[in-house]
């Protein structure tokens, strides 16, 4: 039998040196997980999850907007005495997802565990948890970035974006959300092992990179969290609100670097010759899962 082998480098000991305390390191920040539809999957079941949604009456299969939009003509529903109305049928849409398994591995020898002055295994376990949390956040971000309901600031494609986020763009998104009966979020998931919700004031939540904070603060009518009074932030990373939006920032919601219009005289940040495009994830109640 061939035994598996591996090599690894242990952290160097601080022999012959004054041993200071173990300093804190930057911890990942999860923000997208406070919303969305999250379900626990029972053990020993299929890897494929199939959700079903019945379309509202009259909804068209053109795109995700029309699939969830009612089309009802009152005149077509007038009844005639003695005549049974024509029966309608429900039209389902199945949304499927395949489960994926994620993990990470650190290695430590018994010598390190027995002789090192600090608890290396405990630090490894801590970093495993933090790393998996960031993986989970990146999976969510990838799913949301793949959405097809997209609005562009100062352009019609990502490659033509040449303006910062504006209130006009936010209002366009708001109109579409409301036209599709998207409910404002009134509860966010609590940060605990049990899936529960905490009530919040109704609003559409906006998630974006921390680089976007200056643009958000420049919006007309922006209210900083320090001015909320009795109103509670939805998350420690919430920076404020404007009209029916509440803004949450995170350093992990990375931009599409060097992918917009030519920087030119736009004054926008770029890591190359083109504008860096920052996604703003705007969502209503149960908009994703």
Regions found by a protein language model. Name each.
Residues 1-97:
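N-terminal "assembly arms/tails" that initiate or stabilize quaternary assembly
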Residues 88-116:
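Short acidic, glycine/tyrosine-flanked loop/strand segments centered on an H-E-D-like triad
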Residues 112-192:
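Alpha-helical scaffold segments that mediate packing/assembly in large oligomeric complexes
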């Amino acid at each position: 039998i061939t035994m598996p082998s591996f090599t690894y480098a242990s952290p160097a000991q601080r022999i012959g040196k004054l041993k200071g305390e173990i300093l804190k390191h930057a911890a990942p920040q999860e923000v997208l997980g406070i919303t969305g539809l999250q379900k626990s999957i029972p053990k020993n079941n299929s890897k494929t999850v199939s959700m079903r949604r019945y379309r509202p009456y009259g909804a068209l299969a053109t795109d995700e907007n029309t699939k969830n939009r009612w089309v009802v003509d009152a005149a077509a529903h007038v009844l005639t005495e003695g005549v049974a109305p024509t029966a309608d049928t429900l039209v389902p849409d199945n949304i499927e997802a395949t489960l994926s398994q994620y993990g990470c591995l650190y290695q430590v020898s018994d010598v390190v565990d027995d002789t090192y002055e600090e608890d290396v295994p405990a630090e490894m376990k801590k970093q495993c948890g933090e790393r998996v949390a960031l993986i989970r956040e990146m999976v969510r971000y990838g799913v949301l970035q793949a959405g097809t309901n997209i609005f562009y600031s100062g352009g019609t494609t990502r490659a033509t974006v040449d303006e910062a986020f504006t209130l006009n763009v936010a209002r366009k998104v708001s109109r579409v959300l409301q036209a599709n009966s998207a409910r404002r979020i009134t509860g966010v998931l609590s940060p605990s092992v049990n899936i529960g919700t905490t009530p919040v004031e109704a609003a559409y939540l906006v998630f974006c990179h921390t680089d976007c904070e200056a643009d958000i603060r420049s919006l007309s009518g922006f209210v900083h969290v320090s001015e909320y009074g009795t109103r509670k932030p939805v998350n420690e990373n919430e920076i404020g609100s404007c009209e029916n939006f509440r803004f949450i920032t995170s350093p992990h919601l990375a931009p599409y670097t060097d992918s917009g219009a030519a920087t030119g005289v736009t004054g926008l940040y770029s890591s190359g010759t083109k504008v860096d495009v920052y996604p703003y994830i705007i969502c209503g109640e149960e908009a994703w899962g």
